[in-house]
Design a protein with these regions (language model features):
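Active-site His/acidic residue clusters
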Residues: 245-261, 306
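Non-catalytic accessory regions flanking glycosidase/transglycosidase catalytic cores in CAZymes
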Residues: 1-225, 233-241, 265-266, 270-294, ...
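Histidine/acidic-residue-rich catalytic or RNA/ligand-binding cores of hydrolases
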Residues: 302-305, 310
Length: 531
């Protein structure tokens, strides 16, 4: 059975320019991400700094534009000054966030020099938990100042003559989270004042930089969105972005929950835009705040216990547990655990994050930075021995390759479904989503190259879509083709590595209309070029 669907696109209906940083990634030294994937001095491909050249070369072949580093919860207890200079003089610390030892073999300079080697722009998160304004000032001076001062000359002494030129700086990480070291959960006004003063001082060191202030690190927290409002009232005119994070969970194998996940991001984005615009008017400010969704993901999760009636206690209580049996882990870069994937259709994992990017494209006028938490691993998956491609790479690669220029509005006519509210455990409870479109889409028009691309997800997990793409108004273009990616029922779990896009059969373009059959749970890319 198939369901009829129609999408209309007109190049005159523009949303806003698409920032290349929309397709960025995130890095934090958790597990083997840094000490294993990035750094392993014993690896056969290791360079003189201990970086794995196989991973660097794999990432260079992708279009990943930017990465937020070095964290993450980790930075709220990390002193960057302990990580510079000769390695034998660096201080090893406990990482309270992830209960691991941080040897600082990969330090401030290594993070930035690794980014230079990969050709990926670094976006830096400072410590505003245990750190202070002077730490931030010295960091920008060390990183970006030409020379002639203590910190800039120290950078030269340690081997980097020229400034790194980092342009985007994050004013702490998830500073509202009760799990954060030195959290500002209880005092958003004080964090807003600190962010204001820190941003001001950092920009006095380097007037070319931009800063991002933390808002609520999840729309599921009980203090959201009032915490955000209190922060923004104190620092609106001193910062350039708000830093947003959200992880949406879905029960393993539940197609309806996975395919509707991006709707929760839509609610979050719309609320934050409204909040920023309210504060703009409150401040009588000409500044239109930009958004940075710099940690996001859609992940499978098994159902756990739910303790009804304990919400107010359990939210902070979950993060205030003190287990004397829990020790600290030391990660050996040369002893990485095998990479494992959940036993489920890989298209769910692939489309979950791709749908979030489509949501960001539909708000491209305001969202200028995106950092997929698993982005580096999606772009270039690796284990101890080699790098390889996983199915989630392909939608991400299509978006990075073709999602440039201007985002266009798409009009969607299709059948819909309702998602009931659901709970997976005490901290993962989600309201219902009514009237979820089976068809999810976004479009990008690159006027410089003369290319128009329409990205389409068929969310339907049972039926194909009898699909029509109406591009009336697109004169002087020719239809370049339709690629599709899906998992056939005959494909077993061991064959998932072979899931990849291919030209779709049976797609026909007549005049300004394209007709196609969209497979269930599929990724589709329609391309037009100037004739």
């Amino acid at each position: 059975m198939s369901k009829k669907a129609r999408v209309s696109v007109n190049p005159d209906f523009k949303i806003g320019s698409i920032s290349k940083r929309l397709y960025g990634a995130f890095m934090e030294p958790i597990g083997s991400i840094v000490y294993g994937n990035m750094y392993n001095p014993k690896h056969p491909t290791a360079d003189e700094q201990g970086f794995r050249k196989d991973w660097i070369e794999a990432l260079k072949k992708t279009d990943v534009p930017s990465v937020r580093l070095p964290g993450g919860n980790f930075v709220s207890g990390w002193d960057w000054k302990d990580s510079i200079g000769p390695k034998e003089q660096r201080k090893e610390h406990l990482d309270l966030a992830w209960h691991q030892y941080i040897p600082n073999d990969v330090g401030h300079d290594e993070y930035l020099q690794w980014a230079e080697k990969t050709g990926i722009e670094p976006m830096y998160t400072i410590n505003l938990g245990t750190g202070d304004i002077n730490d931030a000032i010295y960091n920008v001076e060390y990183t970006n100042h030409e020379g002639g001062t203590y910190w800039s000359e120290l950078r030269k002494k340690y081997g980097h003559e020229k400034p790194y030129g980092v342009k985007v700086w994050y004013l702490g990480n998830e500073m509202d989270g009760p799990w954060q070291v030195a959290s500002w959960e209880k005092d958003p006004k004080a964090y807003g004042v600190l962010a204001n003063e820190t941003s001001k001082a950092m920009k006095w060191v380097d007037g070319s930089i931009e800063t991002a202030v933390c808002v609520s690190s999840s729309p599921d927290l009980m203090h959201y969105p009032d915490w955000d409002l209190q922060v923004l009232k104190e620092c609106y005119n001193a910062v350039d972005y708000i830093s947003m994070h959200h992880y949406q969970s879905a029960e393993i194998g539940n197609y309806a929950q996975f395919m509707a996940a991006s709707r929760y991001f839509e609610d979050y984005i719309r609320t934050e835009i409204g909040l920023c615009d309210y504060v703009q008017q409150l401040m009588r400010s000409p500044k239109v705040m930009k958004l940075s969704l710099d940690e996001y993901g859609v992940f499978p999760q098994p159902k756990g216990e739910i303790h009804f009636g304990r919400e107010v206690y359990l939210e902070p209580g979950t993060h205030y547990t003190f287990d004397p049996r829990r020790g600290y882990v030391r990660h050996d870069p040369d002893n990485m655990p095998d990479r494992s994937f959940p036993p489920m259709n890989p298209m769910l994992m692939s489309l979950g994050n791709a749908a979030v990017i489509l949501e960001m494209l539909r708000h491209a006028d305001r969202i200028k930075i995106g950092c997929m938490t698993s982005g580096l691993g999606v772009a270039a998956a690796c284990d101890h021995d080699h790098c390889f491609t996983i199915p989630a790479y392909y939608p991400y690669a299509d978006l990075m390759k073709y999602g440039h220029g201007v985002s266009l509005r798409t009009s969607v006519e299709c059948e819909k479904y309702d998602l009931p509210s659901f709970a997976l455990d005490d901290t993962h409870k989600y309201h219902e989503q009514d009237q979820v479109d089976y068809i999810d889409t976004a479009a990008a028009y690159d006027q410089e190259t003369g290319e128009l691309t329409v990205f389409v997800i068929n969310r339907d997990w049972e039926d194909t879509a009898d699909f029509t793409l109406d591009v009336t108004g697109l004169t002087g273009f020719r239809f370049e083709g339709h690629s599709e990616m899906y998992v056939d029922d005959s494909v077993n779990e061991e064959d998932y590595a072979h899931v990849a896009p291919a030209p779709a059969a049976g797609t026909v373009c007549s005049g300004m209309s394209v007709k196609a059959e969209l497979k269930p749970v599929s990724w589709n890319v329609f391309r037009f070029v100037k004739a």
